[in-house]
């Protein structure tokens, strides 16, 4: 029978529940358990696909094409399980399902209420998402005390009655502030947060205290006393310079032993040697490299979370410190490319909308003309193609129809038909809804033999994840190739969509329509990012 660990948060948001939950999962996995993770989001949006990156941060795409919370990216980076659509659901999805059942008459004319109908649907989705694993770790989004979270908290409260104490465990993450003016650590916010949880029927079994310093034993005793938690179950989680140190931090305080005792699990000791190796590589780099990331969401770097982590993973596997310089594409558009001078490589990530596009094109041009390693991802590939069409292929004013419907050279245009992850033909036009209407999830790509792409991947058939609704217009491919652009990867289907491009006469110029960052992990890295960082290091060595 699957056992459930529920992780809640209190006092303030952005405490790092996802990292703490993923770290617990990593420790339990190292002890031989089959583990999965779920994220329950209390917002009413059906999914985060149409939400602004400035409000929500990155949208993480699963292999089966779900647009999900960025925490699922952390889950995949910390454990071996691959997340699916069922690993993340929202209030919007819950209500959508319940209302559909009511319309069908499934409730036999009964009054549909939050309890039991909404809470039953939440419990059903939790069980469905957990599947057949030893332990499912369920992170409840939001902060205890939020109105939006109440149905989710009630559902997980009921699950203890449904499955029993030996099969359920509650972990509460709370903020313990240090007041510098008084020179004191304050436990009262945590006491009140736990009090609020207990009022709705949930008694935490473990308290994780988020702090900027170590938690003294006296404060541990005080928290344990007032929160009705065993003293050894009050765990300190301190600010770390790498999120990959958190599993070791929690394990050192015995959190996995407490969990195993509570859930009646007899397991071999944790083996965190892989994590120790990762930390050693982070702390002892042999070199450093500077990469310019030119985007429009740089004021909130969480918008590029998987991408920045993928670059760090490449640093781990090349024994180098990767310094990411986030550069606003609007500033490049307005002020020119001075901020790019001294960089060892340039990267233009994905994005949507017209704002800052010309700055990204300037960055591409700078990389091409100065022979600096360039990596373009999704929109970054489209920018590279547009720049090349304008400057090298004799198509002045070339553009994407996303930005200019009247362009004479629509080298990038809306995809009107493609085959999705499940093999179903999808069709779209300019009037289609924005939500859930992109080319999403893992798609097979065929790489040209002998190309840079094939050398990077060491294969000619790959699968990478997508999230976009505009594609290279195949009508202009012959003209672009005649001007020297190489199309090195295409989709495996009959539509033969352009997936990768490169410049044979450039030291390292590569761009892809897919999002390789979604499959990079600290354990294995990703071949594309490793090759990119190696190219940046080589450029640095040649230009000392």
Swiss-Prot record:
* Top-rank taxon, per record: Bacteria
| Domain Glutamine amidotransferase type-1 positions | 290-542
Please list where the region (Amidoligase domain) is annotated. 1-265
The molecular function terms in GO held by this entry are: ATP binding; CTP synthase activity; glutaminase activity; identical protein binding; metal ion binding
Which amino acids does the record list as binding CTP? 13, 146-148, 186-191, 222
Which residues carry out catalysis? 378 (nucleophile), 515, 517
> Which amino acid positions bind Mg(2+), per UniProt?
71, 139
- One GO BP annotation of this record: 'de novo' CTP biosynthetic process
Task: State where L-glutamine binds.
Answer: 351, 379-382, 402, 469
Q: Which amino acid positions bind ATP, per UniProt?
A: 14-19, 71
Q: Activity regulation here?
A: Allosterically activated by GTP, when glutamine is the substrate; GTP has no effect on the reaction when ammonia is the substrate. The allosteric effector GTP functions by stabilizing the protein conformation that binds the tetrahedral intermediate(s) formed during glutamine hydrolysis. Inhibited by the product CTP, via allosteric rather than competitive inhibition.
Task: Spell out the reaction equation it catalyses.
Answer: UTP + L-glutamine + ATP + H2O = CTP + L-glutamate + ADP + phosphate + 2 H(+); L-glutamine + H2O = L-glutamate + NH4(+); UTP + NH4(+) + ATP = CTP + ADP + phosphate + 2 H(+)
Keyword Heme applies: no
InterPro entries found in the cross-reference section? Class_I_gatase-like, CTP_synthase, CTP_synthase_N, GATASE, GATase1_CTP_Synthase, P-loop_NTPase
The entry's cellular-component GO terms read: cytosol
EC numbers on record: 6.3.4.2
The membrane spanning regions, by residue number, are none
What CDD domains does this protein's entry cite?
Answer: CTPS_N, GATase1_CTP_Synthase
Query: Its pathway?
Result: Pyrimidine metabolism; CTP biosynthesis via de novo pathway; CTP from UDP: step 2/2
Q: What else is known?
A: CTPSs have evolved a hybrid strategy for distinguishing between UTP and CTP. The overlapping regions of the product feedback inhibitory and substrate sites recognize a common feature in both compounds, the triphosphate moiety. To differentiate isosteric substrate and product pyrimidine rings, an additional pocket far from the expected kinase/ligase catalytic site, specifically recognizes the cytosine and ribose portions of the product inhibitor.
HAMAP family xref list:
PyrG
Q: How does it assemble?
A: Homotetramer.
**Its biological purpose:** Catalyzes the ATP-dependent amination of UTP to CTP with either L-glutamine or ammonia as the source of nitrogen. Regulates intracellular CTP levels through interactions with the four ribonucleotide triphosphates.
Can you tell me which family this protein belongs to? Belongs to the CTP synthase family.
In its UniProt entry, what is this protein called? Answer: CTP synthase
Originating species: Laribacter hongkongensis (strain HLHK9)
Give the lineage. Answer: Bacteria, Pseudomonadati, Pseudomonadota, Betaproteobacteria, Neisseriales
